[in-house]
Every structure is written in structure tokens, then in C-alpha cells.
Amino acid sequence: MPTNWKDSGLRWYWVVVLVFIADQVSKQWVLTNFELHESVNLLPFFNFTYVRNYGAAFSFLSDAGGWQKWLFTFIAVAFSTILTIWLRKQPTKVWRLNLAYTLVIGGALGNLIDRLQHGYVVDFLDFFWNTSHFAAFNIADSAICIGAGLIILDSFIGDDKEKSQNGQNDNNAAKE
């Protein structure tokens, strides 16, 4: 474990701040410039469409009656805390996991602020093909998904250099 925060994954916390600010600024822009369900076509497959999401990803539990706000608040705080602890224990050089954790934290905190401030999450990125629309989402959702993807990727490939060093250290310890 790194002896100080400067040598740990906490040095990557600037990503949390960047994701959080980009998410909140973009949502504030949507709230200022769009009416609910207003849509502006930008590309043949992409709209800005202001929608409110009272649930989680893909509007999961959006019709649950309000208790889900507190469940998702607890989950966001818990995951952000756990990932921050893990960042503190990781060396700075483990870039893939540090980036992944900070993307997830930034996204979780961005959506957490929406839930606490509005009671819902502001979504506006609307991709579609012909008449089939993917669930609208936001920058925080994107960061969470990219972070989760990096965690999954790292579980398969990891940092080969670090794994080989750990393997050599294990072999040296076994010889002694």
C-alpha cells in the first residue's frame, strides 16, 4: 500500500472532479434551455431530449413510489466511499483501475446530486435508429459505464507488467 496519498490512486481524483463538473454543467444547461420532453435533433441518429429519470439505469424502479431515491442515494455514497478507499490503497501507476474507479465515483456523485436536488436524474442524450430509441442518459451515466467496462477489462487483462512483477516477488518469497 502506498505510504502517502500522492503515491496512491487518489492522485487520479481530478477525474472525479472533471466528470462531476462536466455532468453538472451539461445538466444545468439542459434545465435552463429545454422544457421537459423537448427534443432537438442534432444528427440523423442523435437528439438532445430532456427527460427525468426517477429510477436507475434504463429507468429501473422509476415507478416504485419514491423510496428508490434513498436506495440509490445509499448505493452512490457506499460505492463512492468503497472506491475511494480502494484508490487510497492502489499505487498511482495502476492507471486502468484508478481511471475506472474515478469515472464511477464522478458519475455516481453527479447523479447523486441530481437525486438530492431535484428528486430525479436529468437525462438528455438520446440515440436512436429509425423509430427505436435507446434509453436517454447523461454524462454521469456514460462515465459509470466506461468505468465499469474498464474494471471488467482489467479483470481479464490487468497490467501485465505488474502481474509479472508480483509473480517474481512471489517466486522470490517462496525460495527464501
UniProtKB/Swiss-Prot annotation:
Enzyme Commission number, as recorded: 3.4.23.36
Membrane topology: Multi-pass membrane protein
GO molecular function: aspartic-type endopeptidase activity
Membrane-crossing residue ranges in chain numbering: 12-32, 67-87, 94-114, 133-153
Pfam families linked to this entry: Peptidase_A8 (PF01252)
Location in the cell: Cell inner membrane
Record field: catalytic activity: Release of signal peptides from bacterial membrane prolipoproteins. Hydrolyzes -Xaa-Yaa-Zaa-|-(S,diacylglyceryl)Cys-, in which Xaa is hydrophobic (preferably Leu), and Yaa (Ala or Ser) and Zaa (Gly or Ala) have small, neutral side chains
InterPro entries associated with the record: Peptidase_A8
Single GO BP term: proteolysis
Gene Ontology terms: cellular component: plasma membrane
Keywords of this entry: Aspartyl protease, Cell inner membrane, Cell membrane, Hydrolase, Membrane, Protease, Transmembrane, Transmembrane helix
Record pathway: Protein modification; lipoprotein biosynthesis (signal peptide cleavage)
Residues the record marks as active site: D123, D141
Stretches assigned to coiled coil: none
Superkingdom per UniProt: Bacteria
Family assignment from sequence similarity: Belongs to the peptidase A8 family.
Function: This protein specifically catalyzes the removal of signal peptides from prolipoproteins.
Name this polypeptide is given: Lipoprotein signal peptidase
Organism: Shewanella sediminis (strain HAW-EB3)
Upper taxonomic lineage: Bacteria, Pseudomonadati, Pseudomonadota, Gammaproteobacteria, Alteromonadales
